[in-house]
Amino acid sequence: MKTNREEILQSALQLFMSMNYESVSLQMIARSVGLTKTGIFNYYPSKLDLFIAVADRYLFHLQDPGNKFAPSDGSLRDFIDKYVEGVARTMDEIVRLGNIQREKMPGQLANAGYFHLFQQVLFYYPDGKHKLHEWMEKEFRLWCDVIGRSVGCGELREETDIQEAAALFRQVFIGLSYQMSFSDGLDVGILRKRFLYIYGLLKR
């Protein structure tokens, strides 16, 4: 059984994915979980505190590379498999949490609603721009590390530009995720196919 805190966070996530921050009230969240507004204050003293908790748990924690991807054997080929598996697992969790109120999502899709949450973090989360940059930079460095090792061990061509290759993988993922969020969500089969095409160009 979920604790009140978990219920509050999940209900708040659904509301912040489907509405702008300014439009969401603690009273709306309290009503959705069967608590009084005062009851929510026992967990979160303000709407901003609740929004920060939602972003920390369902964005920054869920998307952290250390939580999102299983360890690979060190090769880029295996990392691609682990990356796509981690993306699929995370996406399933987001859809599971968000689609409870699917009809209220922007475009009626949890995936589009999740991008909506990212945008709100940029504007309402304290120093959100810096925190988002740190998260993106962490994942970029992970790609650079894997590609660098793969060049060093001879898996990839020695003339591979490590940073450009890492940026290419990241931008394919971000671009495809955004484009497909307005239909049925990211197709991880297509993502894998695009990644393996890039891999084929880099492979020794």
PLM regions with names:
Residues 106-120, 126-153, 164:
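Amphipathic alpha-helical packing segments from all-alpha helical-bundle domains
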